[in-house]
């Protein structure tokens, strides 16, 4: 099996490099004009493969360094969505009175070229504030389009400009309630509450949330940038005593650090929690522009004219399965690896889910990370081999997005701002104690009794406005505190 996988990897790299070189020289003049400021190149210094997950026969992002000093990225999919997003983002920036940075792209149907964006520090306090204001605009667009993959590896802090470098999951699928969700009223209201949170700013991936487990086992991950190293709550294979005769593999938690999204003021790392209100200002300004300007909704609807990637299982989970299958005990044959990967199947699974799990296993056997797509006007989900799995979704992504847009309001905006504040608070140093979160309620009466009565009414109104009602039942979202100070 090792021999087969080595041959497979070697062939996929050769095929990809040939494809990249062919595209590079066929578009030489355009690339020189768009990415090189007109400077000519005659060849490459290096092509560095596998700068991301591999899909569909080993295809992945590649870093290309030209002999004129220019570095750019080759991506094995169209970048039309990136261009469309940039136009929308630029429009909102102009409407909210802030500048934006234009990223250079060259897009085709099945691949595209993108300029290299570097992580650079802010020069002054004003730039830091502008950075987080722009993050608020990005957060709103992620919320409006149901994005779920805006984690730290997909956002680069380029001075005062946050730049999103992966748009494959735009637009996402915004969950909607189904009549099949729960047999009892209690189960249905719980499902409604779950859906409300799933469609909120929390699930964009940009805000700090507990990942890879709940409670004390969870790890705080976000795109807001932190200097702290992340320690995985699960074990991964690690090479020990390399370059010696005692080289071996041990399984242990791994420390990792997402560096590209870290914001710095000169050499000082910035704590994003100190700029929560800047994020909220950007979010609210973009939200209010969208409610007032119909052109924004038209531009948003333009994302629903094709397919987008949908995440059915975390990439880290696939990576764990893949790494486990490389253990010497399972590398004896393809059948041995498949026997291990069959753990993906679940007892009593439907024939529908069996087909999806079969595809996941087949992809992992070929060292690919499984990928799925949804079409804006279909209820099907499509796998990376082109297979269609019908009626996976209760309604089409476009229909779901229309329902999402209809519920947008000032009340919803305030609710999302509450989620932002609660989430960002976790970036502050934790003392392990439960925290109180004061809610800003406008209004003040000099008469003490009238003031108390007025504030009570506002609190009651707030509680009622946050209620999730279904049939004859009502529910609310709330916080569950853990010993590590997170919630």
Give the positions of each predicted feature:
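Solvent-exposed loop and edge beta-strand segments that line ligand/cofactor-binding
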Residues: 479-487
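Hydrophobic residue at the +6 position relative to the catalytic HRD Asp in the kinase catalytic loop
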Residues: 153-155
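Short amphipathic alpha-helical segments and their helix-coil junctions
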Residues: 119, 477-480
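Conserved ATP-binding subdomain of kinase catalytic cores across diverse folds
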Residues: 1-147, 161-163
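C-terminal catalytic region of ATP-dependent kinase domains
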Residues: 1-21, 25, 161-457
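Long, well-ordered core segments of solenoidal/helical folds
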Residues: 455-475
């Amino acid at each position: 099996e090792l021999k087969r996988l080595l041959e497979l990897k070697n062939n996929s790299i050769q095929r990809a490099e040939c494809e990249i070189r062919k595209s590079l020289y066929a578009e030489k003049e355009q690339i020189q004009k768009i990415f090189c400021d007109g400077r000519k190149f005659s060849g490459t210094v290096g092509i560095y493969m596998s700068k991301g997950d591999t899909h569909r026969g080993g295809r992945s992002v590649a870093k290309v360094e030209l002999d004129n000093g220019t570095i750019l990225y080759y991506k094995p999919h169209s970048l039309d969505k990136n261009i469309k997003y940039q136009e929308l983002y630029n429009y909102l920036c102009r409407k909210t009175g802030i500048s934006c940075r234009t990223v250079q792209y060259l897009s085709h149907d099945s691949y595209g070229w993108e300029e290299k964006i570097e992580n650079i520090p802010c020069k002054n306090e004003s730039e830091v504030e502008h950075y987080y204001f722009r993050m608020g605009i990005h957060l709103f667009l992620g919320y409006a389009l149901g994005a779920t993959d805006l984690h730290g590896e997909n956002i680069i802090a380029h001075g005062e400009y946050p730049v999103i470098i992966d748009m494959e999951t735009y637009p996402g699928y915004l969950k909607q309630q189904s009549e099949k969700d729960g047999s009892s009223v209690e189960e249905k209201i719980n499902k409604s509450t779950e859906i409300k949170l799933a469609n909120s700013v929390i699930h964009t991936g940009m805000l700090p949330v507990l990942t890879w487990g709940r409670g004390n086992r969870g790890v705080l991950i976000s795109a807001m940038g932190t200097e702290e190293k992340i320690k995985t709550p699960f074990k991964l294979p690690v090479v020990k005593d390399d370059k010696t005769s005692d080289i071996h593999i041990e399984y242990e938690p791994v420390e990792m650090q997402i560096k590209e999204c870290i914001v710095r003021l000169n050499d000082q790392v910035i704590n994003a929690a100190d700029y929560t209100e800047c994020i909220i200002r950007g979010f609210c300004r973009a939200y209010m522009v969208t409610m007032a300007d119909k052109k924004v909704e038209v531009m948003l609807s333009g994302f629903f004219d094709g397919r987008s990637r949908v995440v059915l299982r975390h990439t880290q989970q696939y990576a764990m399965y893949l790494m486990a299958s490389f253990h010497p005990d399972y590398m004896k044959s393809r059948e041995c690896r498949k026997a291990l990967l069959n753990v993906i199947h679940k007892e009593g699974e439907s024939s529908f889910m069996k087909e999806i799990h079969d595809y996941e296993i087949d992809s992992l056997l070929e060292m690919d990370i499984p990928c799925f797509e949804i079409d804006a006007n279909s209820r099907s989900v499509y796998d990376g081999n082109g297979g269609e799995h019908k009626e996976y979704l209760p309604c089409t992504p476009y229909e779901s997005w229309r329902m999402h847009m209809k519920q947008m309001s000032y009340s919803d905006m305030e609710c999302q701002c509450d989620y932002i504040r609660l989430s960002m608070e976790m970036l502050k140093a934790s003392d392990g104690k439960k925290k109180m979160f004061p809610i800003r309620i406008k209004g003040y009466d000099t008469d003490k009794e009238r003031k108390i009565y007025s504030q009570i009414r506002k609190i009651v109104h707030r509680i009622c406005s946050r209620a999730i009602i279904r049939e004859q039942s009502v529910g609310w979202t709330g916080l569950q505190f853990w010993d590590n100070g997170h919630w």
